[in-house]
Amino acid sequence: MVAIDLGASSGRVMLASYYPGQQQLTLREVCRFTNQIKSIDGSDVWDIDAIEQSIREGLSQLDSEGIALDSIGIDSWGVDFVLLDKQGKRIGQPVSYRDSRTQGVMARAQQTLGSNAIYRRTGIQFLPFNTLYQLRALSEQQPHLLADVAHLLLIPDYLHYRLTGQLNWEYTNASTTQLLNIETGDWDSDLLAYAGVPAHWFAKPGKPGNTIGYWHSANGQQVPVVAVATHDTASAVLAAPLIDADAAYLSSGTWSLMGFESGTPLTHQQAQCSNITNEGGAEGRYRVLKNIMGLWLLQRATDELQIDDLPQLIEQAARQPACRSLINPNDSRFINPPNMCREIQNACREHQFPVPNTAAQLARCIFDSLAMLYRQVAQELATLRGRPISHLHIVGGGCQNQFLNQLCADACGLNVSMGPVEASTLGNIGSQLISLGEVADVTHYRRIVANNFPLHHLSPHDNSDFAAHWLQFQSLSQLPKELCI
């Protein structure tokens, strides 16, 4: 089986082999490639052709090796999309969610439709780049494009289409758009109308697990292409070895997503005021979670400072005074500033914290601030569920940053387990194995993952200065009142 896992900064083609007798699961990285935002005609866009080419090269390599493939699946980040014309050809490049075209659009939607009405319909966190606001911006700013559009496909659906020629709309990723009605599981006609787009661009989203079509290889293979849980976080959660019903997960990468699984969505006012999202998951579950800006801040800062030795930077950051400077990582100013280091420094200056000037000080500011935000979100989630979190499972690339994860354990006061690193890839494979009938269900698959990919564990440390630091952070991170209206 092949899992193609696309993140906001890189992509990978991974080969998985499963031996049912021993319930052994192995992964092999076929290729890894960078995925970066490009500026074209004043817009920040994804180079979707380069992504597709890298995927095809990985698949062709496996085909040339004579490896018989059972299935293929693709997962990616959410909310971004590709427009197709009536001939099935792409219209322009897909614009990145970090593009500035949506500035002010969400606030106008909240005023016009009411935050309460939008949230009750969708159960989705208010983020300025949700597809709802991207489409409203498109219809306001480039209405001439709309007449040529026949279909809108989210990123993994588009790439599945390119491999098979078949259109598909997968549910877990569709749920991130803030266009899906949480009661019906279908596109909300009133929100589509507000976005300025017709319903015939879409079909009702399907649950993960169906075969979309087939990829025909140069050597004659006809490989089923499976609609996995195509949102990368949905796949990551599918592979998270949650130990009990009170455990929570933190999918840690470019974004950090903290939450828990629920059989029902939480769309009451307390969830809305906490800006909690209810995204679709496997087996009809909901991923009740919150998006946190995550390691994007560090990625941008290290790029600007031209730092390649990340372990050394983390070691230097660990020697800096704790919580000397704090920011709110979820402040919209950090979505895509011209200069991240300068933006962090300005935020510290404005809130009368010492300005971090060295790379180590900047990194420590980011790590401390993320840990504080993890604590805040963990408390919000526990309050919403009505019982404390028993354990936190950190999955994804951020598993490898043990210093940040120890800060998280300390701030949250929770025992933490770390792993698997390739959680999105493994969740992608899990959807394929369940679809193929090789694995019974998600619970069974999580046992397989836990047995094949050992976890690492951390316990919280006491910190006598923590209470004062926590009060300082709380003053930075109050949610806007308009979310509750």
Swiss-Prot record:
Query: Which chemical reaction does it catalyze?
Result: L-rhamnulose + ATP = L-rhamnulose 1-phosphate + ADP + H(+)
Protein's pathway = Carbohydrate degradation; L-rhamnose degradation; glycerone phosphate from L-rhamnose: step 2/3
Q: Which residues bind ATP?
A: 8-12, 254, 299, 397
Keyword Secreted in annotation: no
What terms describe the molecular function in GO for this protein? Answer: ATP binding; glycerol kinase activity; rhamnulokinase activity
Q: Which InterPro entries match?
A: ATPase_NBD (IPR043129), Carb_kinase_FGGY (IPR000577), FGGY_C (IPR018485), FGGY_N (IPR018484), Rhamnulokinase (IPR013449)
The top EC class is transferase
What Pfam families does the record tag this protein with? Answer: FGGY_C, FGGY_N
Give the intrachain disulfide bonds.
Answer: 348-365, 408-412
Write down the superkingdom of origin: Bacteria
What is the similarity comment for this entry? Belongs to the rhamnulokinase family.
So what does this one do? Involved in the catabolism of L-rhamnose (6-deoxy-L-mannose). Catalyzes the transfer of the gamma-phosphate group from ATP to the 1-hydroxyl group of L-rhamnulose to yield L-rhamnulose 1-phosphate.
Q: What is this protein called?
A: Rhamnulokinase
Q: Which organism is it from?
A: Yersinia pestis (strain Pestoides F)
Organism classification:
Bacteria, Pseudomonadati, Pseudomonadota, Gammaproteobacteria, Enterobacterales
